[in-house]
């Protein structure tokens, strides 16, 4: 288990604020055509990928509950649960892909920005209230579901996860390209 007292909460807060500024800047500067443009390395549009990036923070609230439950159970129970979830990777992948397709029809840029702020504020309040013992509690995760899931993750790891997810997908956006193929303009 990780040494929870080693978690730099301020660094997590700063990362959350950085992603908040970035998310708002991306939404504020994107035209309707920009949001409809394909992304780099995904089947989503920029708008759909932005929603998926927001969802990475939203899902953390559910993951926090899972850690609180499975972190108190024998490790074997958590391992079995992770194996069961890994077995369900195909339906998870389908839902994970299809969710943003419909979500952007309901959550336009303005609603995404509001939702992003709310979820970050909620996560920051929760993190402030966590004890070191809570942050050290952990569980096994389905490693096939996400490249940032490790076999065993603590609550502290879960608070860091959405920013890793955000930064990874941020590189796949084509909002700053001229050609829609991911080519970045030359900077002199």
Where in this protein do the model-derived segments appear?
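Charge-dense, helix-prone N-terminal extensions
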Residues: 1-2, 125, 129
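Short, Lys/Arg-rich amphipathic segments at extreme N-termini
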Residues: 13, 19-35, 170
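A short, structured beta-strand-centered segment in the mid-to-C-terminal lobe
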Residues: 15, 104-116
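Hydrophobic alpha-helical core bundles mediating ligand binding, dimerization, or RNAP-core interactions
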Residues: 16, 20-23, 116, 120-123, ...
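Short, contiguous alpha-helical
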Residues: 36-90, 121, 129, 133-188
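Acidic/His metal-coordination segments adjacent to aromatic residues that form catalytic metal sites
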Residues: 98-108, 147-156
């Amino acid at each position: 288990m990780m040494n929870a007292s080693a978690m730099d909460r301020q660094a997590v807060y700063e990362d959350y604020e950085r992603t908040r500024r970035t998310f708002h800047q991306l939404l504020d500067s994107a035209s309707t055509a920009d949001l409809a443009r394909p992304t780099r390395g995904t089947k989503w549009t920029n708008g759909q990928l932005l929603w998926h990036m927001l969802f990475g923070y939203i899902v953390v609230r559910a993951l926090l509950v899972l850690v609180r439950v499975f972190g108190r159970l024998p490790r074997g129970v958590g391992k079995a649960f992770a194996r069961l979830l890994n077995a369900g990777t195909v339906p998870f992948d389908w839902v994970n892909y299809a969710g943003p397709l419909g979500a952007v029809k309901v959550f336009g840029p303005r609603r995404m920005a509001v939702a992003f702020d709310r979820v970050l504020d909620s996560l920051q309040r929760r993190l402030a209230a966590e004890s070191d013992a809570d942050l050290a509690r952990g569980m096994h995760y389905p490693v096939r579901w996400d490249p940032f899931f490790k076999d065993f993750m603590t609550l502290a790891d879960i608070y860091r996860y959405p920013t890793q997810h955000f930064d990874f997908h941020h590189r796949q956006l084509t909002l700053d390209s001229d050609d829609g193929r991911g080519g970045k303009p030359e900077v002199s």
